[in-house]
Every structure is written in structure tokens, then in C-alpha cells.
Amino acid sequence: EKIYLVDQENGRIIITEETFDPSKVEVMDTFKYSDVWTESQSVIKKTTLNKPSGIFVTHYKGDTLIYIADFANERVLACYEDGSIFMEYTKPSGDLYDANTTFNPKNIVVDNALNVYVVITSITTGMVQFSSDGSFNGYYGANRVEATAEVIANMFWKMIYTREQIMKMKRAVSVEISNVDIDEDGFIYTVTENKNANTDVLKKMNPAGTNIFTNLGYDEYTYGDFLSVYYRGKTYE
């Protein structure tokens, strides 16, 4: 089984095997678009990575599909094993995505329908979701706002303040997602790193974006190592 490593400093992907045999290491540092025809010849346009920060690899209809969070180039690059690009996911246009917000992807996962979920730096409304054809589907799995004393007090004041006073109030926003993963059943997991927050630190979400852990009553989190874990009918020590 192959292991894919992101070399952020050198802008490349390193592919190795479980044995880490140096003779079998592959490097992906140049990626090519489809042929662009001119009157005289076929020209292959190429591109490179700029501070990549995450990768997701899946298999679909016999092909190995590689999705790379190309952080500084503000895109998710999707390609085959030979480096041929079949899709670029870039900053969405339209009213749903703030034009003043950057598009710096940190990590990505892809479900069985090839929908793409992207963790973006400074986005607090959840992960950015794309369909397989590159269409922007909106946001998925936003964290809830931490119910602090200030937030609760602001809810009270909003009931009696004028519209002008409310506009001047400090906005309560959720914390951005730190990382994401997906299991073989299609459930998406997110973690949120914030020393002052306990809300939605760890989530397991269904296709609707609902946190199943909360529904099961797991509102309290225990930190540290577990001696055993129960998962899918089995106990792992």
C-alpha cells in the first residue's frame, strides 16, 4: 500500500511504500493540464504547488484520484497518479462566498460520490463543499457558537435593543475547523483546536452535517489516551 506525504517546504508530494524503501520513492512536483492546441503544435501547460498543506487519495472506477490542498495557490488540485489534472477547485464566486475572504485550503476529504469538503483558513461557517464537477454547494458542518456568559447576555440585549444598537454589538462567531477525516462508511469527522472552547471540539457527521456524537449524548469530552475503544461491534485495545 502506498503512503502519500506532503512536502510543504519544497512544494511536492512524496509517494512511498509501507517499508519506506528508498528505491521505490516517487516524487510529484509538476502537474500538467490537458493539451492546449495551437495551429502548429500541441502545448502542454504545466503547474507546480506552493506550500501544499493536505492531501486525500481515493480510488474510483479503477483510477487513483489525488486531491491536494494547494494552500498558497488558493486552490485544491485534483489529478491522476501521472500528474494529469482533471479538476481545480478554486475560490467560489457569488453571494454565498464573501469576496473579501481568502481561499487557503488546509485539508480536504472526498466522499464516495466525489463531493469535495475543504477546510479553509479563517472560514468559520464550516467546510466549503464542492460537487464532483467543481460546482460550489455551500458550507458543511459549521461549529456551534460557544455558549459563554457573554453570548447569553447578548441574546438578552438583542431582545430590547434597537436595530442600530444591535449593529454595533460584537458578533459571536463559531471557531473554525482545524482538520477533517472521513471513514469507509462516509461519516465525516472534524476536530477544532481552541483552548477556550468545549463546543464541537470533535464531531462525527452524517451527510446532512448533523453531529452524531451530540445526538448520542457525547457533550462532554475526556482528554488523554483510552485503554480500549469500541468501534463497529469490536473492542480495540
Write out the residue ranges for each language-model feature.
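Eukaryotic scaffold repeat domains enriched in small/polar residues
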Residues: 1-237
